UniProtKB/Swiss-Prot annotation:
Any one of the GO CC terms: host cell nucleus
Inactivation phenotype: Inhibits ethylene induction and promotes P.sojae infection in soybean.
Gene name per UniProt: Avh238
Induction comment from the UniProt entry of this chain: Expression is strongly up-regulated during the early stages of infection.
Name this polypeptide is given: RxLR effector protein Avh238
Function summary: Effector that suppresses plant defense responses during the early stages of pathogen infection. Suppresses cell death induced by effectors and PAMPs in plant hosts. Is able to induced cell death in tomato, tobacco, eggplant, and potato, but not in A.thaliana. Interacts with and destabilizes host 1-aminocyclopropane-1-carboxylate synthases. By suppressing type2 ACS-catalyzed ethylene biosynthesis, Avh238 facilitates Phytophthora infection.
Region (Disordered): 49-70
Biased composition (Basic and acidic residues): 61-70
Record's signal peptide: 1-21
Keywords, sorted A to Z: Host cytoplasm, Host nucleus, Secreted, Signal, Virulence
Additional remark text: Avh238 is highly polymorphic among P.sojae isolates.
Family membership: Belongs to the RxLR effector family.
């Protein structure tokens, strides 16, 4: 979209300074309109020349097409925000580590008891496995 704008400005500057300005200004108006109104740019118009022309009207505000300015002014702010979000995520994981560890120990003890009942381990191995680590 910017490229089309810059090309149009360059053509206008060259046309103004040349003797062919009148010829260029009488170009078919539909040609310029077709170049601008194509594909996605149709959804991004901010101004409409004719309010009755629904073809160029901005889409309804459904939250999907709305364009907003970014909330961050620099990459450092984005980096800080991502670090904060990462730290919150890490703190949640560390907060759950006690429960996760207890669950893993319970599963290991159950597996050790099942192995002892099937005869895969001895009584001494069972006692050593069930002893609390130092």
């Amino acid at each position: 979209m910017r490229g089309v704008f810059f090309v149009a400005v360059a053509v206008a500057i060259f046309a103004r300074s040349s003797a062919e300005a009148k010829l260029l200004s009488e170009a078919a108006p539909g040609l310029a309109a077709d170049a601008v109104i194509s594909g996605e740019s149709r959804e991004r118009f901010l101004r409409v020349a004719d309010p009755e022309d629904d073809d160029l009207a901005a889409p309804a505000d459904d939250g999907k097409t709305e364009e907003r300015a970014p909330k961050f002014k620099s990459l450092n702010e984005i980096h800080k925000k991502l670090d904060e979000e990462d730290m919150v995520h890490v703190s949640k994981i560390l907060g759950n580590m006690g429960a996760i560890h207890a669950d893993n120990i319970a599963k290991a003890r159950a597996a050790l008891k099942a192995a002892h009942e099937s005869g895969a381990t001895t009584a001494n191995q069972l006692v050593a496995g069930l002893a609390k680590p130092v």
